Amino acid sequence: MAKKPDNPNYKVIAENRRARFDYAIESDLEVGIILEGSEVKSLRQGQSNIAESYAEVKEGELWLVNSYIAPYVQAKTFGHEEKRRRKMLVSRKELSKLWNATQREGMTLVPIVMYFNHKGLVKLKIGIAKGKKAQDKRETSAKRDWNRQKARLLKQNG
């Protein structure tokens, strides 16, 4: 069963469900993101997708690349680009940690979940991850199935 958030104001906007399947996530980090007004209004309607996006450190800044935020219908004249690079807010110490992590072979920055925090600000949880091979994916799937089967047996017998 999914864990309930500690704060009732915590609202998930978009979730990258493939991230945990395709990548072995070593650690995660909460970052802010710079958005335009029409993007925030579109996110409040839940119209976004981060499944195909990734993060990159470029020229001393952290960027979210290839994320989709649907256009806000009421802001047609002053709307926003649907897929554009969006700057993320992170401290210098965390930025250097992320840059060092991505310099290791096979490591990448993957967005895990986008949400509104208790103050109503859009936050993004990104993970430092390493891509899984097909065999690793099968092992993860087998472990998950075995844990479900164990839970079923314990529920029936206990």
Swiss-Prot record:
It comes from the Bacteria. Disulfide bonds: none annotated. GO terms for biological process: trans-translation. InterPro entries: SmpB, SsrA-bd_prot. Pfam families: SmpB. Residues 133-158 are annotated as: Disordered. Residues 149-158 have a biased composition (Basic residues). Residues 133-148 have a biased composition (Basic and acidic residues). Gene3D superfamilies: 2.40.280.10. Belongs to the SmpB family. NCBIfam families: PRK05422.1 (NF003843), smpB (TIGR00086). This is SsrA-binding protein. It comes from Jannaschia sp. (strain CCS1). The lineage of its organism: Bacteria, Pseudomonadati, Pseudomonadota, Alphaproteobacteria, Rhodobacterales.
